[in-house]
Structures are given as structure tokens and as C-alpha cells.
Amino acid sequence: MKQLWFAMSLVTGSLLFSANASATPASGALLQQMNLASQSLNYELSFISINKQGVESLRYRHARLDNRPLAQLLQMDGPRREVVQRGNEISYFEPGLEPFTLNGDYIVDSLPSLIYTDFKRLSPYYDFISVGRTRIADRLCEVIRVVARDGTRYSYIVWMDTESKLPMRVDLLDRDGETLEQFRVIAFNVNQDISSSMQTLAKANLPPLLSVPVGEKAKFSWTPTWLPQGFSEVSSSRRPLPTMDNMPIESRLYSDGLFSFSVNVNRATPSSTDQMLRTGRRTVSTSVRDNAEITIVGELPPQTAKRIAENIKFGAAQ
């Protein structure tokens, strides 16, 4: 596995230093076309998802039926794991677990969230850099880097089919250019008949909608005084921690439209210590000060998570 990741990093690195790379509005427009194609076309993708934990082989089918999205993600190897989208409901089927349904706009499991991003929203804070063209899955592809201007986030490289505008490969890179995750299409098909083959899903009985508990709305006595450019608060809540005698934890969720993270604050305990853990794209950074335990969880480099925690200000409720 180490050799595989080293080889991928070399290939990605050669793209990063292309002499012809340039940031252009046209690259952002192409990415916006990818967003539209991914949600409007009838198509099927067979792909592999690679990260530090291993390699998965999957199939994704998408169609528009009665002006509603219908999609299926299926794990091709091992126990059958399936995710089905019908309209704004996402149903999960996994061995050993009771099937359940959640509300959602699209399937996120094993698919790069970049595909569904509104690139117009990102344009003030990100550069979209054209790197050239190459072939993936026997298709000619545009290659585009997506890089935050302030250097505080991970970056992406996208290989997009020049005809269908569907993504053929997406690499997530850390700030040193190392590949953290890769989505790579092996075979694909764009065909109106795919909607016909998915008619059974359109009529299938799906599991009941799972009720997600809503956290208590409250004003907090803390706020972050520094965030990476473009991030804004999406939601906030206060919930008890069952594993810590129902101690309340206060949380704020932030997103820039591509990456997200949460800031979580609870009362420090005698066992509270500073910790830093990164697994793939996800960082968990815990720091203790002012009798509080501050934990940053999300899709951020460890240095950025640490800086956010250091800039939490305690004071009057807000």
C-alpha cells in the first residue's frame, strides 16, 4: 500500500508543477458544468475509492425520474452494502444493522463532496487552475486544481471528461501535496435507458425516516476570533454527553461550501489533555484552557485546527 500511495503522489506532484498551469474563470465554469452534469444526467460509474485504510470497489447509478433524483451506490466486493436516494431521502442498507432513512440532497458516502459543490460560492476564496489534459478511463479529461488562496485547507485535483463533464478522477491532497484520498472511475456509461433499469428502486418500499434529535438552542459564552476565509456558521446546538454523565457540550458547525468542521466546547475534567489526531481527511484537535476542553473536528489540516482552537475567546453570552 505504501508503494501505491508513493506512486500516486509522484503522479500528482508532476501535475502540481506544470509550467502551463494557470487560474482562469473558464476553469471555474467547467467545474460548475461538472456539478450540473452529475445531478442532471442519467449515468452509471464503476469506480474505486482509495484512502489510507484501503481500497473499495463500488458502482454508482444516477437518473432523473419525474424530475426527482434517483440514485444507488453499491459496494461490489464483500458483504452487500447499499445506499439508495429517492428525492431528498437517503436510505442505508448494511449487514447487521436495521435499515434506516435520512433526509439529504445527495449520497456522500465514497463520492467526493466536491462533485456537488457550488463553485460560484467558492470563487472568492479558491483558485481554479487549469493544468492541461490527459486520459482517464480511456476518456480525454480536463485537469483542474482547486486550491484555497489562504493556504489553510486541503486541495483537490479533478480530472473531468471533456464530453459528458462527469468526474473521472478526484484526488484530495494535503498541504504537502500528499494524496489523502482518491476517487477513480474504471468504467462508465451515459445513457437514458439507465432510468428504465432503476424503475424497481423508484417503486421499492424504503425504511422509515430516522428522527434525528435536535439540540437545544442556546447562546454560548465563547466565539472563534479567527476562521479560514470563506467559512461561516451553519448551525449551533447544546447537547448532553451520555458518556460523561450527561455533561453539556456546545457545538458550532462551520462550512465554506467545500470543507466543514465543528467547534465543540465542554467543561474540562481532571482527565482532559491536549491531543491531536488525523485520520485521512479528518482531524480531531483537543486543547484545554480556561477550565474548558475545546475540540475541533473536521476536514482541516492539523495546523489550521490548532489555530482555530487557540483563537477561541471566552466572554459574554452570544
Curated annotation (Swiss-Prot):
Keywords: Lipid-binding, Periplasm, Signal, Transcription, Transcription regulation. Residues 1-23 form the signal peptide. One of its GO terms (cellular component) is sigma factor antagonist complex. Disruption phenotype: About 2-fold increased sigma-E activity, 2-fold decrease in stability of RseA. The keyword Iron does not apply. The keyword Transcription regulation applies. Binding to RseA is inhibited by LPS fragments; phosphorylated N-acetylglucosamine (GlcNAc) with N-linked acyl chains are minimally necessary to disrupt binding to RseA. Once RseB is no longer bound to RseA the latter is susceptible to DegS degradation. Thus if periplasmic LPS levels increase the sigma-E regulon is induced. Residues 222-318 are annotated as: Interaction with RseA. It comes from the Bacteria. One of its GO terms (molecular function) is lipid binding. Part of the rseD-rpoE-rseA-rseB-rseC operon. Negatively modulates the activity of sigma-E (RpoE) by stabilizing RseA under non-stress conditions. Although not essential for association of sigma-E with Rsea it increases their affinity 2- to 3-fold. When bound to RseA it prevents proteolysis by DegS, which is probably relieved by lipopolysaccharide binding (LPS). The N-terminal domain (residues 24-203) is responsible for oligomerization, while the C-terminal domain (residues 222-318) interacts with RseA. This is Sigma-E factor regulatory protein RseB. It comes from Escherichia coli (strain K12). The gene is rseB.
